[in-house]
């Protein structure tokens, strides 16, 4: 085991504060509408230009192992806030730096770090409750657009396109972000439920222009095994043919004689039927078939529920207004399932999302919710160069997370004002002893810091602006994009309550740990061995 260096007390604190400051100073220049860019080196290709706090934080690794510990702890603040709320990473970093800075002043003056931590925790809990109390729900598309714009560094186009996407697919719908091919941002919306399986034979195509099979008002047969024998299918086909409607068959596979018969019937116009493979694999396939059954008001034909293909009646089949089947995708539009059953299914999947342990499972479950809820929107980000595309795409993703957070827990006035207004809830707060009171004072000062940094980045005097904002009440604050004061909610300067709350909680959590640290242990730097002397051989011809 390599030898370690151990340092204590003031020396340890000085090192950790240096690390915190290096990382926080690099991140905080990006805060606010007039925040600056940070350029990140890449091992290959062009450098990345970003205004995203967590992207900057993730790149920082310091050569001094002791200072690096401080930097990594603050990096954790940004990452955790990003995971919880999807935005607010720079605010969280600024708050953590302020709590560490103010806290160490008290530690140096002889206050007990553990009691300081308890005071900080007490104050933060009160402020979080106050933020929840002043938050108001997002009701209009305009508010969603404003939240998105602020998060995307005051880019109104991005805010608007996200609001449009949410209008189209609903607040539960899936919105994905992809690289566009032009200079402008574009929005593509897929209505209904789409899954990534297409027709099993090109002979099913009945719309040559779009190269799709289009079924109007079809029945939907859902089967969890392979179909290869046409005899199994005949009872169903006869009933559907009598009803004079088309049929969509979704099964593990349709092959051989069964597929050939369907194709021949389709070409001859006897029965319009299209076969596709069921989406997913294993247990996920069963779950998705069940989703489609609930959406279309049908039943999955499976031995487990005592149903076989020969015994299928029209009551067992699902129905939809329209189905479009392409080479790679199938879209079911306006299924005949009951609203109540769909809602119950969505709630059930949401419960599974809460219990999911892996990001992959969570993502797949969220996709299923969106497909049941009614659609998927794709935002295609346009830009002139690849570097600009990456930067813009990161901002769109941030804005998307922020708008989701706003829908979840509501909105508060932005520009650091919500935290300032929440001060009133802890002004009279008392701890169990003077050291805890000092912890409360640390938070009182630290929550001014986001506004101070926004103002500093905009080139104004922080103390003057903070005092002027404190003279006002309610939503009165400073709009850094044009240097004016007014009602920030009316001006459209909004933050999601969840982002503000998460930023403070995560900052206080890590900063408190740093304050109560009194020793650092790290590997000693390896001493570089002196380079070997070059070989002196082959020096003949010297005349000795």
From Swiss-Prot:
<keyword id="KW-0963">Cytoplasm</keyword>
<feature type="binding site">
    <location>
        <position position="415"/>
    </location>
    <ligand>
        <name>ATP</name>
    </ligand>
</feature>
<dbReference type="GO" id="GO:0140662">
    <property type="term" value="F:ATP-dependent protein folding chaperone"/>
</dbReference>
<keyword id="KW-0413">Isomerase</keyword>
<dbReference type="GO" id="GO:0051082">
    <property type="term" value="F:unfolded protein binding"/>
</dbReference>
<keyword id="KW-0547">Nucleotide-binding</keyword>
<dbReference type="InterPro" id="IPR027413">
    <property type="entry name" value="GROEL-like_equatorial_sf"/>
</dbReference>
<feature type="binding site">
    <location>
        <begin position="30"/>
        <end position="33"/>
    </location>
    <ligand>
        <name>ATP</name>
    </ligand>
</feature>
<dbReference type="GO" id="GO:0042026">
    <property type="term" value="P:protein refolding"/>
</dbReference>
<dbReference type="InterPro" id="IPR001844">
    <property type="entry name" value="Cpn60/GroEL"/>
</dbReference>
<feature type="binding site">
    <location>
        <position position="495"/>
    </location>
    <ligand>
        <name>ATP</name>
    </ligand>
</feature>
<feature type="binding site">
    <location>
        <begin position="87"/>
        <end position="91"/>
    </location>
    <ligand>
        <name>ATP</name>
    </ligand>
</feature>
<dbReference type="InterPro" id="IPR002423">
    <property type="entry name" value="Cpn60/GroEL/TCP-1"/>
</dbReference>
<protein>
    <recommendedName>
        <fullName>Chaperonin GroEL</fullName>
        <ecNumber>5.6.1.7</ecNumber>
    </recommendedName>
</protein>
<dbReference type="GO" id="GO:0016853">
    <property type="term" value="F:isomerase activity"/>
</dbReference>
<dbReference type="GO" id="GO:0005524">
    <property type="term" value="F:ATP binding"/>
</dbReference>
<feature type="binding site">
    <location>
        <position position="51"/>
    </location>
    <ligand>
        <name>ATP</name>
    </ligand>
</feature>
<comment type="function">
    <text>Together with its co-chaperonin GroES, plays an essential role in assisting protein folding. The GroEL-GroES system forms a nano-cage that allows encapsulation of the non-native substrate proteins and provides a physical environment optimized to promote and accelerate protein folding.</text>
</comment>
<dbReference type="GO" id="GO:0005737">
    <property type="term" value="C:cytoplasm"/>
</dbReference>
<comment type="subunit">
    <text>Forms a cylinder of 14 subunits composed of two heptameric rings stacked back-to-back. Interacts with the co-chaperonin GroES.</text>
</comment>
<dbReference type="InterPro" id="IPR018370">
    <property type="entry name" value="Chaperonin_Cpn60_CS"/>
</dbReference>
<keyword id="KW-0067">ATP-binding</keyword>
<comment type="similarity">
    <text>Belongs to the chaperonin (HSP60) family.</text>
</comment>
<keyword id="KW-0143">Chaperone</keyword>
<dbReference type="InterPro" id="IPR027409">
    <property type="entry name" value="GroEL-like_apical_dom_sf"/>
</dbReference>
<dbReference type="Pfam" id="PF00118">
    <property type="entry name" value="Cpn60_TCP1"/>
</dbReference>
<dbReference type="InterPro" id="IPR027410">
    <property type="entry name" value="TCP-1-like_intermed_sf"/>
</dbReference>
